[in-house]
Amino acid sequence: MKTTLVSTLLGMVLVFAIACSSDASRAKTIANDASATPPAAADRQSKLDPQMKAVLDELASLGGKPIESLPPEEARKQPAPADAVKSLMKKKGMSTEPEPVGKTEDRKIGSNPARVYWPKEGKKPYPLVVYYHGGGWVIADINVYDATPRAIADQAGAIVISAEYRHAPEHKFPSAHDDAFAAYKWALANAKSLGGDPKKVAVMGESAGGNMAAAVSMMAREQKVQMPIYQALVYPVGQCGRYDSKSYNENAMAKPLNKAMMEYFCKNYVSKPEDQDNPHLSIVKAKDLKGLPAATVITDEIDPLMSEGKQYADMLKDAGVNVEYKNYDGVTHEFFGMGTVVDKAKDAEAKVASDLRSAFSK
């Protein structure tokens, strides 16, 4: 009887040990799978332009935390892609001094800072570009986005006014959009004193700034203010509230912008659910785009916002607006302004500057 009991107990122990070993093995496999790069993300990584990858690798080395996991005040302290560009330039032995322009001058538009860039060449009166930086209405400022205004001032032969705006969540929608429109009206009113031509004022923006540049064009039409002569929209935010487009699905885990970050930005900026249906915020929900200024729309392949940027370009075309649309493969959100280290960024900057020059010459 004892022998049988001992044998039974030993058998039970052996079965339990095998089960535990199997569970541990399964747990290890699950852990390994969780830490591995998702197949879709790995596929997007394989499409990266080598120069773009170098910037993203450098950004990763700066040790920033995920923006979407942080309070806004902490998110604003994280390294930006512009920091990665400067770090990479240092490693390459390149000068990190800003691209020279004719001159710069810091101003105030209401209570918001602004920086005015004059071109090195050309003669008065210059055309003007009112530029709005990116950052999801939450992070970044005119200092972070210094490279683009310099490139455009130089290459388009225009005065560029980089206009700051109030940030969320301290200031909810439509605060930033109202500030953007106020900056545009300030440019019209002060163009002559800056040495510019008030009849040749364009708007331009990147990401959230591209969204606001599009909205400013709508607001000018609605309020019967002189409309911009042109709008340059670089990977504009198309809407808040929906994150299920083809490019959102394909680039949900992309860097430096992913789906979770866009949800975070919109959550911080939107004050009430119905804001998400406002065409000034969700430009792809606009019902009437007829009569808006001609546009250049730039998108990039590895970017959650690519589909919406293309959608808005198509909507403008369908409304009879003259549109120049170009998508850049192998690069990511924020590539524009990286012309010192990414050739495709240099090409995109030249494309926008050329289109602006053409608009100003008419």
Model-flagged regions — what are they?
Residues M1-L9:
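Bacterial N-terminal signal peptides that target proteins for export
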Residues S21-D23:
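Bacterial signal peptide processing site
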Residues S25-N32, A36-A82, M89-K362:
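Alpha/beta-hydrolase superfamily serine-hydrolase fold, recognizing
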Residues A17-A19:
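C-terminal motif of bacterial Sec signal peptides marking the signal peptidase cleavage site
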